Amino acid sequence: MHLELRHHAGGMPVLCVHRCVIVICVHGVVCFVNIFSADRVFLVVQMSIHPFVGFADGASRSTRNLSSAAWVIYDPAGELINLQGVCLGRTTNNIAEYSAVLELLTEAVNLGIRELLVYLDSQLVVLQLNGHSSVRNPSILHLYLRIRLLERNFDYITYQHIPRHLNTLTDAVANLVLERHLRNL
């Protein structure tokens, strides 16, 4: 995965993440996020009121029942300001997905972020966090309620589903964390 910051016509900085995301900024405010693969643009989001963008992902290895969580935050200038991952130990993939959102929101609060657009590749988590599906699992409900408490720190927060192949940076970090942990066992 490679990151680079380019300046295009009009001096607009564009953060290029190979085969993942382009964030275009005008006067320090994120205007568009283009998620793409090869030559096809899959998603264009107008974001004049959402200066910060976060991506979250959980990963698990069924053979070892190990899971990890990863999250990425871009600032209003389109700069990658936070990229982290953590091994969660033995847990389920759904708990890993929720843990990634929880860690992302915790970091955003610590950074003083008040408006956030969150992208996830887990449709179930997006449906539940947007109130379109209920949470029944007690372990997940605990994480869900912690996320709801953290949301009180934001003036605006929303969750959007993206296909798995468009969440490549956080997926790569989550899998790298798992691989490093497995090598150290």
Task: List PLM regions with ranges.
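RNase H catalytic domain
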Residues: 59-63, 102-174, 180-182
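Residues forming the Rossmann-fold NAD(P)(H) cofactor-binding site
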Residues: 98
